[in-house]
């Protein structure tokens, strides 16, 4: 993210909606009562909430004063919200968002299903799961005790993330003072940023924004070391994608110093990836390759946020700059319309963050033309997943498609921010881009 002096000015943040990010392993068949969302991982994720907690998706819409998912999607895409949508103050916003987590983690009952003598109370340790009575909490403890500590981090991060939305949390930036080849993981990255990082975090901890944030929640502010840790986790979550792209470029030794710059495609880009993205969010990729002559990062997917959509062909790439743009389409359609026609250059690298094609036949059907295209055109391709289980399932699919796997394993630049499975809070939290796979063309002939 660019320093404050370089960031474009933003209007007052729009009314915030809870962004529902469901790990792909939770996506399951769509209920017949709901319209088929197509190849949208965002829509599938939202609808699948009801599989674990019946009625949860409607509770979320109710708290936002919305009738259906179409209204929800309209607003997060920048459309005009219904007149009843919005929050009168920040305190109300946080309360409404917290209300969307209010269901019994054991019996799955929602607030409207409680008897008159019962009330949902949160776990006092993590403040992140709710129970309708002590019996449910006692019965759930064997499962919850395994994740309680991590879910406490999730609860803090969920609040602190608002500082990224408002722009109060500006990540440290600027050319790397160390040699790029010395930065191999988060430990070396944090060591390199050193005093600059500590100065940024300490200034934010003592800021008026931080004070008002916790005051609006109406609960005690955590200790400084807890908040410090949260800010560092959020930082890795923002920077994980650009640095993972850099990992891909390093793996296949792409010549980033070529005339005209390099083109990177992020395929299957979700709304979560592109909502509120800022021009400086990928600057760290440039610092990773100080000799680069320009990066054009194009995000392609059916859920790309409206603010990112623009005509990529009209942008001239200046040496040393990074340009972000988006196209709302399936990748193989985008390829036919933009690449085969010569409007845009062939990509040097293609990346898919959590494509989820292993989890749903519908998603696999949508991804198959893209995977075959990338294989047949021998485009270096990077894929990230949440877990070892997803890694193994995705590898098997790619092997069955006869792709040539050139690298895979734990991602040294995985996000360190734990992600709670929304409708199944006692499921082990996952971490974005925890593992990666790279393939290039077809498997060599035996």
Curated annotation (Swiss-Prot):
Zinc finger (MYND-type): 104-148
UniProt keyword Membrane present: no
Keywords from the UniProt entry: Metal-binding, Zinc, Zinc-finger
Binding site for Zn(2+) 1: 104, 107, 132, 136
A GO MF label: zinc ion binding
InterPro entries (UniProt xref): Mito_gene_expr_regulator, Mss51-like_C, Znf_MYND
PROSITE patterns according to UniProt: ZF_MYND_1, ZF_MYND_2
Domain of life: Eukaryota
Binding site for Zn(2+) 2: 123, 126, 144, 148
Short name of one Pfam family: zf-MYND
Protein name as annotated: Putative protein MSS51 homolog, mitochondrial
Gene that this polypeptide is encoded by: Mss51
């Amino acid at each position: 993210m660019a320093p404050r002096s370089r960031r474009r000015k933003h209007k007052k943040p729009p009314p915030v909606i809870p962004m529902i990010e469901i790990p792909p392993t939770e996506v399951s068949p769509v209920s017949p009562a709901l319209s088929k969302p197509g190849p949208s991982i965002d829509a599938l994720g939202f609808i699948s909430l009801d599989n674990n907690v019946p009625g949860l998706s409607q509770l979320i819409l109710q708290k936002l004063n919305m009738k259906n998912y179409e209204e929800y999607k309209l607003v997060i895409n920048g459309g005009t919200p219904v007149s009843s949508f919005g929050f009168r103050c920040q305190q109300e916003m946080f309360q409404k968002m917290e209300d969307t987590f209010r269901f019994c983690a054991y019996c799955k009952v929602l607030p409207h299903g409680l008897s008159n003598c019962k009330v949902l109370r949160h776990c006092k340790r993590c403040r992140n799961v709710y129970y309708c009575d002590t019996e449910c909490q006692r019965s759930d403890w064997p499962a919850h005790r395994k994740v309680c500590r991590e879910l406490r981090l999730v609860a803090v991060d969920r609040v602190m993330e608002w500082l990224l939305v408002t722009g109060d949390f500006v990540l440290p930036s600027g050319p790397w003072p160390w040699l790029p080849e010395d930065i191999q993981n988060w430990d070396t990255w944090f060591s390199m940023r050193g005093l600059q990082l500590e100065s940024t975090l300490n200034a934010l901890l003592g800021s008026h924004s931080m004070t008002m944030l916790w005051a609006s929640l109406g609960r005690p502010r955590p200790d400084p070391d807890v908040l410090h840790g949260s800010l560092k986790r959020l930082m890795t979550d923002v920077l994980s994608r650009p640095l993972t792209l850099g990992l891909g470029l390093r793996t296949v030794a792409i010549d980033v110093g070529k005339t005209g710059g390099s083109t990177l495609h992020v395929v299957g880009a979700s709304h979560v990836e592109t909502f509120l993205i800022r021009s400086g969010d990928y600057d760290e990729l440039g610092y990773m390759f100080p000799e680069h002559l320009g990066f054009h990062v194009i995000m392609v997917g059916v859920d790309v946020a409206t603010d990112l959509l623009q005509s990529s062909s009209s942008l001239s790439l200046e040496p040393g700059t990074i340009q972000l743009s988006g196209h709302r389409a399936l990748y193989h359609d985008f390829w036919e319309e933009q690449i085969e026609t010569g409007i845009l250059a062939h990509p040097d690298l293609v990346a898919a963050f959590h494509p989820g094609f292993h989890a749903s036949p519908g998603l696999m059907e949508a991804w198959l033309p893209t995977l075959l295209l990338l294989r047949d055109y021998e485009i270096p391709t990077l894929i990230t997943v949440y877990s070892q289980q997803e890694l193994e399932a995705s590898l098997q699919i790619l092997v069955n498609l006869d792709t040539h796997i050139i690298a895979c394993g734990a991602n040294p630049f995985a996000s360190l921010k734990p992600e709670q499975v929304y409708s199944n809070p006692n499921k082990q939290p996952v971490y974005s881009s925890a593992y990666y796979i790279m393939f290039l063309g077809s498997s060599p002939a035996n």
